């Protein structure tokens, strides 16, 4: 079968032929129809320090996808051949304390699809049936293919009550932009997002941001004054991993505010801890998606009118993957979709 693989320890990926995976007793085989390019895939493409330490070579990668079940193991229940599914990319052990307590997103033995094991940039993917998630017919393949990052945005944004609250989002990547739409959908008052990328800030405006602020030209304090925010933001969603963005967020938070951290800052990042302590801030780290509460919430929000269509900006056939990755690398895109139906 065709697959996009890391074949050598160097930048780039290669469209190549690999062996079709085998189905275990508790697995499903999915014929892939659409995939999306993630920021993780960009790290793998660039072959940066993280990728060099993490990604086995050779291996085909990718973890944002949708497809159709074409084969099932003999122990699988609850699915049928022909079911349209996406799937949870974190494969958990099922036996550690957190897994047994229903907190699988906190499994200490997590294995990542397309990171630690063969991924979804291929004609076929095999995963445990437990990880597969049926997609309702009214949700398009393109939207279903981005459930992984949509889930990151959902997990982060819904970590705290947003009804009537003022929300600051730092980082207008696709996940931050989707968090804008989620926050507005569930009843936030002001949703302000910051970045230095004008293209993506404009996407955030289309998704409902009250203000999309280029912090290289505009002061967040001035924006708060324009919005008559005398006390600061109630909730912060840090999506960038940029130390200066997190520092600015801490300064802009109201006393008693709550912050969810999805972005990964450098290991030695220093912050002003007096902002955290004297303001009584609550900070929560976010990893992946809650299994499977986040997935049910994603479907429910789409079915109740959440519109994510502006984030789907570019579509390519898989044979044009180099152009697709160049588009993503340019920074002037939302989500980039790869079509595998002609592979």
From Swiss-Prot:
Site-annotated residues for Important for catalytic activity for the proton relay mechanism but does not participate directly in the coordination of zinc atom: 148
Pathway given in the UniProt record: Amino-acid degradation; L-threonine degradation via oxydo-reductase pathway; glycine from L-threonine: step 1/2
PANTHER family reported for this sequence: L-THREONINE 3-DEHYDROGENASE
EC number: 1.1.1.103
Cofactor binding: number and manner: Binds 2 Zn(2+) ions per subunit.
Binding site for Zn(2+) 1: 38, 63-64
Pfam families the UniProt entry points to: ADH_N, ADH_zinc_N
Positions bound to Zn(2+) 2: 93, 96, 99, 107
Annotated gene: tdh
Protein name, entry field: L-threonine 3-dehydrogenase
Cofactor(s) essential for the protein: Zn(2+)
Location of the protein in the cell: Cytoplasm
Gene Ontology BP annotations: L-threonine catabolic process to glycine
Family recorded in the similarity comment: Belongs to the zinc-containing alcohol dehydrogenase family.
UniProt KW keywords: Cytoplasm, Metal-binding, NAD, Oxidoreductase, Zinc
